[in-house]
C-alpha cells in the first residue's frame, strides 16, 4: 500500500533507489542497524547530524520516535540559514515487517516551514550477496524536487557511515 502523496509532489519525480552491498556483513547486521534503538542511532542521519532514538517499537504499526540534531558547525549554520530548528522530533510507523527480508517505514514529515504535514515511505529489502549482505532502499519523492534532492543527498551521506559501523560491530565478535 502506497502512502498518501506528498503535497504538491510533481508527478515526474520517481522513487529513488540505493543499492548497497557490504562484504563480510550479515543480513542480521543490517537488520539490527534498522530495527534496534542502538543500531538505528549509530548511523541514521547525514554526516554532521546525530539522532537520539526515544522509542523504537518493532512491530507492524509500531512507532519510531527520534530527535534529529544538527551537531557539526556547518550543519548548524545551514539549518539556521534555512530557518529550520537545530533539533526536530521525528516520528514514524513501521508499516510492514518481514524479519531479515523486508522493512517499510513511514515517516511523518511535519517540520518543513510552510508545508502541510505528509507521509514519506522508505522500503528496505535485505538479502545475502556473495560473502556479505545487500540492502536495496527505495525512498519516495518529497513534496518538491529540491527537498527530494536534499533527502537523497542526506541518505547518501548517512549510508557512508555504515561501513565503519559494521566494522565496529564485527570487531566485537
Spans of model-derived segments:
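Short, surface-exposed coil-to-beta transition loops
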Residues: 17, 51, 87-91, 117-122
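Beta-strand/loop substructures that line and gate deep hydrophobic ligand-binding cavities in soluble
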Residues: 95-96, 104-156
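Short, P/G- and charge-enriched loop/turn segments at secondary-structure junctions
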Residues: 4-7, 76-83, 111-113
Amino acid at each position: 500500500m502506497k502512502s498518501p502523496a506528498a503535497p504538491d509532489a510533481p508527478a515526474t519525480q520517481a522513487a529513488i533507489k540505493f543499492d548497497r552491498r557490504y562484504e563480510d556483513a550479515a543480513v542480521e547486521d543490517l537488520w539490527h542497524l534498522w530495527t534496534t534503538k542502538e543500531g538505528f542511532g549509530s548511523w541514521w542521519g547525514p554526516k554532521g547530524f546525530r539522532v537520539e532514538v526515544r522509542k523504537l517499537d518493532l512491530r507492524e504499526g509500531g512507532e519510531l520516535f527520534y530527535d534529529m540534531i544538527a551537531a557539526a558547525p556547518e550543519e548548524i549554520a545551514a539549518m539556521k540559514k534555512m530557518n529550520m530548528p537545530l533539533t526536530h522530533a521525528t516520528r514514524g510507523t513501521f508499516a510492514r515487517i518481514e524479519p531479515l527480508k523486508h522493512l517499510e517505514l513511514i515517516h511523518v514529515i511535519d517540520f518543513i516551514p510552510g508545508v502541510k504535514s505528509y507521509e514519506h515511505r522508505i522500503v528496505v529489502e535485505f538479502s545475502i550477496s556473495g560473502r556479505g549482505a545487500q540492502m536495496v532502499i527505495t525512498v519516495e519523492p518529497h513534496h518538491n524536487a529540491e527537498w527530494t534532492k536534499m533527502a537523497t543527498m542526506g541518505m547518501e551521506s548517512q549510508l557512508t557511515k555504515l561501513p565503519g559501523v559494521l566494522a565496529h560491530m564485527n570487531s566485537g565478535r
